[in-house]
């Protein structure tokens, strides 16, 4: 069995530290090695006291070569865990402490803080409450070193839901929160008794509300517009103790609870066996070891991680890991250094967007010499220049898409290499995938970058207005230019197939038929192969509410793309088959099966349009090209021989949205029309493309009544 990676981590997430300027991190990891499985019933627990070669010390229960039962692990640098273990992972009650003095005491599960627990930071900040997968999640209370306090709901380390925040000077807010800021309905009460009760957004009042002081009240029908002139005069002449005169530019009490300023906690507590060279059986005396800490160019101590454990057996991953000696190794290092710099530079800029932020000319070149500079770290590659496009806009987009800035930076710019694979299409682009598979980086043509920057204001407005939009989520646009080398432009976007469920089949569907089949033999097709329109053998049945939401969103997204003169986009679909017969007889654990059952019933924890969407796939015989011609099939009786429908979990989104109908595409259409039906060609006018695409979607997605 291949053990998963585990980490013991102390992170100081001060705003300037965690976001790339400078941060501390002490990580613990044991190198994964092959070991024997631990039997639930037959494993014998021995009490050992063992000093490891690297100076670490373990004292406690040992079973099948890994910590099991209760035990204490002391690292040579002073970190310590004491508590319950299960099969080499901290599970149950335990206490973790760091040399800095920070501690966590409470429940652990699978090597992470999970359940009820108390964290005390080095500055005296204290959090008591619920944790989930290493993060504050659920109800919790936090006391800050400056005297402030918060009681309420948390989500992924941020205040989210209902909560009460009390400032040390007596000011108080009670109401709704979202992503760590005051948003929703709530009441602010100042220490002198003045109150504002109304709607909030991003920490400021919006919409309707009531301002009260003493016996006086002023109603607001939209922030900054008072209901009566008399009330306006009263407000203008009245000063509040904690803020300036109420206006659109009011400065409300600063909230000292951005979790980016918090002291980090233990990331992953787990032990993995290392079989000694003298042990040929693999099940005898074993010893733990951790990989050497690596000093990154930014000065941070960290370790390499290996891919996460997968419950469904070995899964082939696309591409190859970019390692030293790879032709694009320096390019990967450069983009990691650049993104780390960009995220750190703009992380603390929380101002509102300005029209000038969308200016395509808003691009900033930064020089990265190997020896480093005042603003850039030293590195091992050749000198290069780095360009950011509209950085403030993409900073806001990442917030809009609920991307944690620190997690984003660490996923791309940690000391794990990226995986590179070629485009499954004809673009010739290269793709880079983070090891956690959350983010994808794609090299782009200059013309595509121009299209994105031109449409950026309308794109931002569209995804802000329609939270369930299926169009690609863009997180950044950058350019790398080595000294004496060519420019490489690329975008960072979300990976649609980052899923806890195995993706068994994937399709890239345009609604056209000319050339829309995979050019591979049946034996060469695997789970990473992206199939096309003529390879599709299914129609998908969605429950009524899902179907209506999906079709409505497709219409909205297509209208947006049509207005931007975009064509040649695709619906990318990933299928997870629940039935073992449809997925090479891969078995599931009970917990995963229960979670799938909840999804199919419509009450799963991860349900969102395009992500973990429950459906039924009805298999039909292989469609022919004429099948996709207009009116060739209808929703109730698709052409082809039917088979029994099977339950699936779908992932889907609209991709490749940066091709406008330029002169090149017009010439392509004219040329291909000489050899094929013009209606079957992908390169057509955006209005026709949009209509054909939507008609096609309505043929393969059916309302399951």
From Swiss-Prot:
Keyword vocabulary terms for this entry? ATP-binding, Cell membrane, Kinase, Membrane, Nucleotide-binding, Repeat, Transferase
Give the SUPFAM superfamilies listed for this entry.
Answer: Histone H3 K4-specific methyltransferase SET7/9 N-terminal domain, SAICAR synthase-like
List the GO terms this entry assigns under cellular component, sorted alphabetically: apical plasma membrane; cytoplasm; plasma membrane
Domain PIPK residue range list: 321-701
Q: Could you name the domain of life of the organism this protein comes from?
A: Eukaryota
Which reaction equation describes what this protein catalyses? Answer: a 1,2-diacyl-sn-glycero-3-phospho-(1D-myo-inositol 4-phosphate) + ATP = a 1,2-diacyl-sn-glycero-3-phospho-(1D-myo-inositol-4,5-bisphosphate) + ADP + H(+)
In terms of one coarse class, where is the protein primarily found? membrane
Localization annotation: Cell membrane
Please indicate if the UniProt record lists Cell membrane as a keyword: yes
Enzyme Commission designation:
2.7.1.68
Q: Which molecular function GO terms apply here?
A: 1-phosphatidylinositol-4-phosphate 5-kinase activity; ATP binding
Quick check: keyword Cytoplasm in the entry?
Answer: no
Q: What class of enzyme is it?
A: transferase
UniProt region (Activation loop), positions on chain: 661-682
Pfam families xref list? MORN (PF02493), PIP5K (PF01504)
Q: Which CDD domains match?
A: PIPKc_AtPIP5K_like
Which Gene3D superfamilies would you find in this protein's record? 2-Layer Sandwich, Histone H3 K4-specific methyltransferase SET7/9 N-terminal domain, Phosphatidylinositol Phosphate Kinase II Beta
Q: Where are MORN repeat segments found?
A: 58-80, 81-103, 104-126, 127-149, 150-172, 173-195, 196-218
What does the record say about the knockout? Basal shift of ARAC3/ROP6 and ARAC4/ROP2 positioning and broad lateral localization of D6PK in root hair-forming cells leading to basal shift of root hair positions.
Q: Name one GO biological process term.
A: root hair initiation
What this chain does, per the entry, is described as:
With DRP1A and DRP2B, required for the precise coordination of polar ARAC3/ROP6 and ARAC4/ROP2 placement and subsequent root hair positioning during planar polarity formation in root hair-forming cells, probably by mediating the correct basal-to-planar polarity switching of D6PK into the polar, lipid-enriched domain.
Protein name as it appears in the record:
Phosphatidylinositol 4-phosphate 5-kinase 3
- Which species does the entry assign this protein to? Arabidopsis thaliana
Gene from which this protein is expressed: PIP5K3
């Amino acid at each position: 069995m291949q053990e998963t990676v585990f980490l013991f981590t102390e992170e100081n997430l001060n705003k300037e530290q965690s976001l790339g300027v400078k941060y501390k991190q002490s990580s613990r990891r044991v190198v994964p090695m092959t070991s024997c499985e631990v039997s639930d019933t037959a494993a014998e627990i021995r009490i050992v006291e063992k000093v490891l070669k690297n100076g670490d010390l373990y004292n406690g229960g040992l079973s099948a070569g890994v910590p099991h039962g209760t035990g204490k692990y002391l690292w040579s640098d002073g970190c310590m865990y004491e508590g319950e273990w299960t099969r080499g992972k901290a599970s149950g009650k335990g206490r973790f402490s760091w040399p800095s003095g920070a501690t966590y005491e409470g429940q652990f599960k699978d090597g992470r803080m999970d359940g009820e627990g108390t964290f005390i930071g080095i500055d005296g900040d204290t959090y008591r409450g619920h944790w989930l997968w290493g993060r504050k999640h659920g109800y919790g209370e936090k006391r800050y070193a400056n005297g402030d306090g918060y009681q309420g709901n948390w989500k992924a380390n941020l205040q989210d839901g209902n909560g009460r925040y009390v400032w040390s000077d007596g000011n108080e807010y009670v109401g709704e929160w979202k992503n760590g800021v005051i948003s929703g309905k709530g009441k602010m009460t100042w220490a002198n008794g003045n109150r504002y009760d109304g709607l909030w957004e991003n920490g400021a009042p919006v919409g309707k509300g009531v301002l009260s002081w003493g016996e006086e009240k002023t109603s607001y029908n939209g922030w900054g517009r008072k209901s009566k002139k008399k009330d306006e005069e009263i407000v203008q002449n009245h000063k509040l103790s904690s803020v300036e005169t109420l206006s659109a530019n009011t400065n409300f009490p600063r909230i000292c609870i951005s979790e980016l300023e918090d002291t980090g906690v233990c990331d992953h507590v787990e032990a993995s066996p290392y079989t000694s060279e003298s042990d040929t059986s693999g099940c005898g005396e074993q010893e733990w070891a951790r990989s050497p800490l690596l000093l990154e160019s930014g000065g941070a101590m960290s370790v390499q991680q290996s891919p996460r454990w997968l419950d469904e057996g070995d899964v082939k991953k696309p591409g190859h890991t970019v390692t030293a000696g790879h032709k694009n190794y320096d390019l990967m290092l450069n983009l990691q250094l650049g993104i780390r710099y960009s995220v750190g530079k703009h992380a603390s800029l929380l101002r509102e967007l300005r029209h000038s932020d969308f200016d395509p000319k808003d691009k900033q070149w930064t020089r990265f010499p190997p020896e480093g500079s005042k603003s850039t770290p030293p590195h091992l590659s050749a000198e290069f220049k780095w360009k950011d496009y509209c950085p403030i806009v993409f900073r806001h987009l990442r917030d809009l898409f609920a991307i944690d800035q620190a997690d984003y930076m660490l996923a791309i710019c940690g000391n794990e290499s990226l995986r590179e694979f070629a485009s499954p299409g004809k673009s010739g682009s290269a793709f880079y995938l983070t090891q956690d598979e959350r983010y994808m980086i794609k090299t782009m043509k200059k013309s595509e970058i121009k299209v994105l920057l031109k449409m950026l204001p309308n794109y931002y407005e569209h995804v802000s207005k329609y939270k369930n939009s299926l169009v690609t989520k863009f997180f950044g646009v950058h350019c790398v230019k080595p000294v004496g080398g060519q420019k490489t432009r690329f975008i960072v976007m979300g990976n649609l197939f980052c899923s806890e469920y195995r993706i068994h089949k994937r399709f890239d569907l345009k609604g056209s038929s000319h050339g829309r089949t995979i050019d591979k033999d049946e034996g060469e097709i695997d789970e990473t192969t992206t199939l096309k329109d003529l390879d599709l053998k299914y129609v998908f049945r969605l429950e009524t509410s899902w179907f209506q939401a999906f079709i409505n969103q497709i219409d909205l997204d297509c209208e947006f793309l049509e207005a931007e003169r975009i064509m040649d986009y695709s619906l990318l679909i990933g299928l997870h088959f629940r039935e073992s017969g449809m997925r090479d007889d891969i078995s599931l654990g009970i917990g995963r099966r229960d979670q799938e059952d909840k999804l199919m019933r419509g009450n799963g924890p991860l349900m969102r349009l395009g992500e973990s969407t429950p459906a039924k796939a009805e298999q039909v015989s292989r469609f022919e090209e004429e099948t996709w011609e207009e009116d060739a099939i209808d929703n109730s009786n698709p052409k082809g021989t039917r088979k029994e429908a099977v339950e699936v979990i779908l992932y889907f989104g609209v991709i490749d949205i940066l091709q406008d109908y330029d002169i090149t595409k017009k010439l392509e259409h004219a040329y291909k029309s000489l050899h094929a039906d013009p209606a079957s060609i992908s390169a057509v006018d955006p209005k026709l493309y949009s209509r054909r695409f939507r008609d096609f979607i309505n043929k393969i997605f059916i309302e399951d009544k």
